[in-house]
Amino acid sequence: MKITIAILLSIVIGVTAGDLRTLVYPPFKHTWGIHKGTESKLDMLLGDVTDFDNPQGIAVTRLLAWDDPDDNKDDDELTAYGINGNRDQIIYNTSMYSLGLYGKSGSGKGQFNSPRGISADPAGDVFICDTGNKRIVHIFNDGDELGWKGSFGQDLLVEPHDCSVTEAGTLYVTDRARGTIEVFTYNGEHVRTLGGLVNPRGIAVDHPKITKTRYGYERIFVLDGDGAILRSLDYSGKMLASVNLRDIPEDNSAGKYIALDFYDNVWVTDSAVCKIHKFDKDLKYITSIGECGDDDYQFDYPSGIAIWRRFGQTIVGERHSAQYFWVGTDITRFETSITKEEESDSTVEISLFITDRAYAKIEVKKDDDVVRQIYEHKRLRQGSVSIRWDMKDDAGNRVPPGKYKIEITYEPTYSSYGFFDETIDTEIDIP
């Protein structure tokens, strides 16, 4: 995997991979120990022609023009696009080793005025919310460079903020000023308006035609209320679920942009508290990642986020940089209890909360010897998981009283599978 898949793979700060987390830095051999972009490295790649200046939306895709169908080793080589808002330009990788710029200030061809959201598909189509010009700009990547295709929406849009393609020829656009989601064809024909929102921001759409999605639901995820509320809608605009970001364990949350992974988990950048919030496809809260700062696993005013669904490669834009992660997993709750029933029926209940699907080996040990292997390589679902041990050893005999250790070794099922694992344990006193 070559590091310049990211829009900023201007990346300069190097570390070896650490412990397993919900988002994890890739191992050294995949990134040469590089996972974070800086302005000095951007200058090295492009010359002193631009700086990170109000980064906004990010998009990633695997270009068909780059694909060699006879070589699956290149399937993780992505094209990434990032909006450099105050410079009215797009930063993108022209190859796996070089960056390019597209756009300048203005209202004509190849020009932008305070662009915000961006979305792209494998065929090479790229759409930008040219917010200040009240339009959508359509450009095309032929595998070598970006070229102008046209613009549309000027007669309808007031403040286009973010957009999301379906890969079926339709584009969903949030209009913050109108409180709507506008649906267009790739050719710019207006299909319909979905109303009832208040200052919508980020948007992400699932669709059966989207490359590498597990479910392929016809579903829209949108940040409403200036980023305070995350909603799930069907394609008719009917609300299916919603969650107030201020009800999760954070204060003053303000969601910026959204990305979906392979399983339709919803990842939301929150610039107010320097975190990324993760929800499942039904908008049940899973976890929050990060804190304010510029060290590892910290964020500085996170804005855009993009995930390549097939492998979980994740890019997060910040005030003056970007970070590159893989989707991992974590166990954030590990509790045990003994049921208060008759002795012959007593069991130990193991209660876990898992932030992404995981493979787990679960063993009961006495003085470091395994007395019971509950699971050897069990796939566990995301969220709350309950496992019971009947207090018997591998031979089916009731274990004698004493202190036992329950040990769990788990690893991700997604992009980082085979590269990371984590072992946790707890003691329990069996009467």
Regions of interest found by a model, annotated:
Residues 41-49, 99-109, 145-154, 189-194, ...:
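A short beta-strand motif characteristic of beta-propeller blades
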Residues 297-338:
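Blade-level signature of beta-propeller repeat domains, shared across WD40, Kelch, NHL, RCC1
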Residues 94-97, 140-144, 185-189, 234-238, ...:
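Short loop/turn segments that connect beta-strands within beta-propeller blades
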Residues 18-55:
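A short helix->beta-strand "capping" segment at the edge of beta-propeller domains
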Residues 48-77, 108-122, 154-166, 197-215, ...:
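Beta-rich, blade/repeat-based domains predominating
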Residues 67, 73-75, 79-82, 125-127, ...:
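Conserved beta-propeller blade signature
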Residues 370-402:
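Glycine-centered tight-turn motifs at strand-turn-strand junctions
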Residues 85-86, 131-132, 176, 225, ...:
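Short loop/turn segments immediately following the C-termini of beta-strands
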